[in-house]
Amino acid sequence: MEHKNIVATIYLKNGQAVKGMDNFEPMGWDVISLARLYNDSGIDKIIIFDLSDDDEEHEKNIHTIKNINRNVEIKVCAGGNISRFEDVKKFIYAGCLQVIVNGAKSNSMDIAREASDRFGKERILVSVANVDFVFKHQEEMQEHFHELLVLN
């Protein structure tokens, strides 16, 4: 029997929940209250996308993710603005069970390799815009990634 998860998504910009990857209008909810609502509603996992533009905003979002993890009991995964292995570490140390690496970035395989060696492949996910990545990197995917997120 297949196991299905109900997953909620939070998009973070400047430490606040916004409406989407391309819509930075605030959701109108405090992000901690939103995460608690998901936690109390039977959601299995929250995926958080860090939409930061610079290191200062990235650190603010990491701090927000750490606060979310302190306030929920469900799995939290995060990704976004990952350009080096240290960014993966920041998400893990903020309490995320899994980290999402962007498959479209040229250095994603190097980051994933180092992260899966350090933290285990079950903690590393890859996001792609289309399934071409899967066919081009099939061996590496099995070795370094636990799940695939197709964002379309």
Where in this protein do the model-derived segments appear?
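Conserved N-terminal beta1-alpha1 strand-loop-helix module at the mouth
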Residues: M1-I74, I82-E86, K90, K121-V126, ...
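Conserved phosphate/oxyanion-binding catalytic-loop motifs
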Residues: A78
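Glycine-rich phosphate-binding active-site loops on the catalytic face of alpha/beta enzymes
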Residues: K90-I111, L149-N152
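Short, well-structured alpha-helical patches and their helix-loop capping segments
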Residues: A104-N107, S116, F133, E140
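C-terminal helical cap(s) of enzyme catalytic domains, especially alpha/beta-barrels
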Residues: D110-E122
